[in-house]
């Protein structure tokens, strides 16, 4: 299964990316322990809970924040109306370097959208008994984000019948993607 995910996962993840992200982005970082050392998982989530991107880096500094922000801006092609982060100063320095500091907002409690998006990763990490390398973590988490976005339906916004329709459509998408590979 792992070889299949490593081979076909990036292709499936690329096909499933949403064309347009919401204009409010939440950025956050959390540590992961890989092979006995601490690395940082940087994650960007939009206001609707869709994971925009993940990045696994060895450091938690301005360069890592810059790399994530540049990657997001290049991928989505626009500057968000609002960029919400926690109080890590690296975000402010990176936003200043990119010239988007007027869109940046530090908010301790408004960043819960990004904080909560780490929970599925923590569950997967426990089930997999950790990640073996930084590269394998990056590959898995990128693919997992695409699959999560496909099946994640904001349940509290929908009725049960609509939720079932969304899940059926997501399953059809999954079966089509798996059959194509």
Region locations from a protein language model:
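Acidic/histidine-rich, metal-coordinating catalytic segments
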Residues: 80-91, 108
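C-terminal domain-tail junction helix/linker
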Residues: 127, 138-181
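Short, basic alpha-helical nucleic acid-contact segments in DNA-binding proteins
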Residues: 2-23
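Mobile genetic element proteins and their domesticated derivatives, centered on retroelements
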Residues: 1, 28, 44, 49, ...
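RNase H-like two-metal-ion nuclease catalytic core shared by retroviral integrases
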Residues: 107-124, 132, 137
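Two-metal-ion RNase H-like nuclease active-site motif
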Residues: 21-34
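Short conserved beta-strand segments at catalytic cores or DNA/RNA-binding microdomains
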Residues: 35-51, 61, 69
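Active-site beta-loop-alpha junctions of metal-dependent nucleic acid enzymes
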Residues: 3-7, 54-77
